[in-house]
Every structure is written in structure tokens, then in C-alpha cells.
Curated annotation (Swiss-Prot):
Site residues by UniProt (Important for catalytic activity): 229
InterPro entries xref list: AP_endonuc_1, AP_endonuclease_F1_BS, AP_endonuclease_F1_CS, Endo/exonu/phosph_ase_sf, Endo/exonuclease/phosphatase, ExoIII-like
Coiled coil ranges: none
Keyword Transmembrane helix among record annotations: no
Signal peptide: none
Superkingdom assignment: Bacteria
Protein name as it appears in the record: Exodeoxyribonuclease III
Record-listed Mg(2+) 1 binding positions: 34, 258
Annotated site, Transition state stabilizer, chain positions: 153
Binding site for Mg(2+) 2: 151, 153
EC number of the protein: 3.1.11.2
Gene3D superfamilies listed in its UniProt record: Endonuclease/exonuclease/phosphatase (3.60.10.10)
Length: 267
């Protein structure tokens, strides 16, 4: 099975990228983040002829996630059980019958957080990671495999930072989000739960592979970016991981998202 995660940065703006992903990679499951469209206005004309079941959890103008699956899921869940009616639309889950067992797929657009000093955005990021952790520990049956994918907005190690050492130091000094010690501690709890980074499993020392590139500074042109999009899997799946990648060819298209899709394949 092949899984692709892509922060599309506006579904209506980038149907050409979604179509190219499907044509080239033929994934079984696609997780989209930042679709920026309300559920009642979802553009089914973009997705109806692609060969997928389509599920979404969105709001007008911001955030929003979607799952596209070749097979019909047994269950779809939108949001965390602890979400209130004002919660941002950032997470969607599906249970799929697979050769690996009953697989829970969690697709998330994790808060960016802005900076340690931000009064609302930084605590919101911490809460989102805590809500995910609580969901895993209280709701998920660990005997079943699980895959978490999305724009997680954290660079887990210094290998995942490609913005230059001066910028790295400045971001840390000013408390800018992506690789703060607190963020890495939240992320580490996912590893402690038993999840593995599919990309790192097959590329343990790669330090030049990134999934996000800043528009304004034209970071894509000289490979200046961050690896903040991830596919994390439980051990049973990690053992079956045969290939991973970052689809830079899709990022190189006209009118692209600032993120590149990432993918992982399991056999």
C-alpha cells in the first residue's frame, strides 16, 4: 500500500498538483492538509473522477483536511473526541481493512505555533499534540497498526533543518517555531508511544531532504527548507516499509503549494 501526505495549500487553487500526484504515484490513500474549503462548499468536481472515496473536514478560508481512499473505509472520524464546536478543522481519521490488519489512518494539519511568545498559537500547538497523545493512549487499540501523516510543523532533528546555521540559531534565539526544544519533546512522545518515522527508517542520516520551502525567499531553487511533513507508523508497519520519498517533481510544478508531497509504501 502506498500513502501520500500533501499540504496542498488550497484545494481549489491546485487541482493540477493533485491530479499529477495520482497519475504518477497511484497512491492507495491520500491525506490532504490545508484544503481551505468549508464542508458545504467542497469542490467535488475536482475529485469525483479520480477513482477515490473522498472524505473531508473543513472550514471556510483556513485549515481543513481531506482523506482520499481507494477502498471504502469501515469508519471515518472527524476531529478529536475532546474537540468543542469552535475547534479548528485539522484532523480526520479512517479505519481501513488491510493486509496488515485493521489500520487506523490519522491525517492532520498540525498548528504552526508561530513562536514561543505567541499567546494563543503556541499553546494551541501544544494542546493539539496533547490531544493526539491522549487519543492514542485512550482510544487506539495498540494491537492494530496505525499511520499518522500530515503537516506536523516540527523538524524532529537537526538533520531536518535546511535553512542555514545562522537562521537556525536565530530561530532558536527568538523562539520561532519548528524545532524548539519544547516542540521536540511533544514529538518525542509519539516515538515513545511506539511510532517510527518512515522516512528516517530508510534514510537515517540524510540531511538534504526537505518538504517545505519558503515562497518569498525562493527556497526551493537552492534546496533551502525544512522537513516538517511526516508519515509515522507503528512497528508492525515500519517493518513492512519498502520505499519512501519526497515528491519534489510536484513541488517544481507551476503555481505549487509551498510543501512537497511525501509518500511511503508498505508491502
Amino acid at each position: 500500500m502506498k500513502f501520500i501526505s500533501f499540504n496542498i495549500n488550497g484545494l481549489r487553487a491546485r487541482p493540477h498538483q493533485l491530479e499529477a500526484i495520482i497519475e504518477k504515484y497511484q497512491p492507495d490513500v491520500i491525506g490532504l492538509q490545508e484544503i481551505k474549503v468549508a464542508d458545504e462548499a467542497f469542490p467535488y468536481e475536482i475529485t469525483e473522477n479520480l477513482g477515490y472515496h473522498v472524505f473531508h473536514h473543513g472550514q471556510k478560508g483556513h485549515y481543513g483536511v481531506a482523506l482520499l481512499t481507494k477502498q471504502e473505509p469501515k469508519v471515518i472520524r472527524r476531529g478529536f473526541p475532546t474537540d468543542n464546536e469552535d475547534a479548528q478543522k485539522r484532523i480526520i481519521m479512517a479505519d481501513l481493512e488491510t493486509e496488515f490488519g485493521l489500520l487506523t489512518v490519522i491525517n492532520g494539519y498540525f498548528p504552526q505555533g508561530e513562536s514561543r511568545a505567541h499567546e494563543t498559537k503556541f499553546p494551541a500547538k501544544e494542546k493539539f499534540y496533547a490531544d493526539l497523545q491522549q487519543y492514542l493512549e485512550k482510544e487506539h487499540d495498540k494491537s492494530n497498526p496505525i499511520l499518522i501523516m500530515g503537516d506536523m510543523n516540527i523538524s524532529p532533528s537537526d538533520l531536518d533543518i535546511g535553512i542555514g546555521d545562522e537562521n537556525r540559531k536565530r530561530w532558536l534565539r527568538t523562539g520561532k517555531c519548528s524545532f524548539l526544544p519544547e516542540e521536540r519533546a511533544w514529538y518525542q512522545r509519539l516515538y515513545d508511544y511506539g511510532l517510527e518515522d518512515s522516512f528516517r527508517k530508510l534514510n537515517p542520516t540524510a540531511n538534504d531532504k526537505f518538504s517545505w520551502f519558503d515562497y518569498r525567499s525562493k527556497g526551493f531553487d537552492d534546496n533551502r527548507g525544512l522537513r516538517i511533513d511526516h508519515i509515522l507508523v507503528s512497528q508492525k508497519l515500519a517493518e513492512r516499509c519498502v520505499d519512501v520519498g519526497i515528491a519534489l517533481d510536484i513541488r517544481a510544478m507551476e503555481k505549487p503549494s509551498d510543501h512537497a508531497p511525501i509518500w511511503a509504501e508498505f508491502k
